[in-house]
From Swiss-Prot:
Residues 112-204 form the Ig-like C1-type domain. Residues 26-109 are annotated as: Alpha-1. Glycans are attached at residue 143. Belongs to the MHC class II family. It is a single-pass type I membrane protein. Gene3D superfamilies: Class II Histocompatibility Antigen, M Beta Chain, Chain B, domain 1 (3.10.320.10), Immunoglobulins (2.60.40.10). This is H-2 class II histocompatibility antigen, E-D alpha chain. Residues 26-216 are extracellular. The lineage of its organism: Eukaryota, Metazoa, Chordata, Craniata, Vertebrata. The chain crosses the membrane at residues 217-242. It is found in: Membrane. One of its GO terms (biological process) is antigen processing and presentation of exogenous peptide antigen via MHC class II. PROSITE patterns: IG_LIKE (PS50835), IG_MHC (PS00290). It comes from Mus musculus. Residues 110-203 are annotated as: Alpha-2.
Amino acid sequence: MATIGALVLRFFFIAVLMSSQKSWAIKEEHTIIQAEFYLLPDKRGEFMFDFDGDEIFHVDIEKSETIWRLEEFAKFASFEAQGALANIAVDKANLDVMKERSNNTPDANVAPEVTVLSRSPVNLGEPNILICFIDKFSPPVVNVTWLRNGRPVTEGVSETVFLPRDDHLFRKFHYLTFLPSTDDFYDCEVDHWGLEEPLRKTWEFEEKTLLPETKENVMCALGLFVGLVGIVVGIILIMKGIKKRNVVERRQGAL
């Protein structure tokens, strides 16, 4: 993706710091971020709300639909998708103006950091989820491919929208449901305009190496022995010190 032509990009962020809430003597501060952008040459945009780093909802631009991160949120609040579409239209118009003023100068590409981990401790034969965490990148354009034993996987995959960071970079999560096995290894391959070639992170099952019972017993016995030796040596040194002091006191008394 690094060979793609110049990208012209503009982000529109509205950040609101909520009034401090006091509970007894505790001061609490929360942040709501409305993040939206329109991207060229992809001709697509995103509109979402973030609360303390977690997505509340985003708007599916193509379907003109509000998608809540948790269904329960829709029971307590509502958001008209048309409002987001109107904002994206304004962003597009502003972007056209900025392109002319900047002489089509592209924004800088910031390559992502990628980490792969499991959602919970892994046990063989028990379903789990792999998480591919893509962080600190810009612009918000990534291609992500899951691979099992080197072959692409398309079932059981999901992802979040692009999530804003305080430094105006982005982060994103991709998920893969899987059944842990000693025969399989998994890769999360990430392609971004800031990378010269796709970045691949590998995950494979690692068995926990436990000491055999006999070795554990030997280690415990050795530790106990060393501890007892230390105690005995300490007592001997103390007794010698007391004895030496008594001899000195007797000599001084005789004088």
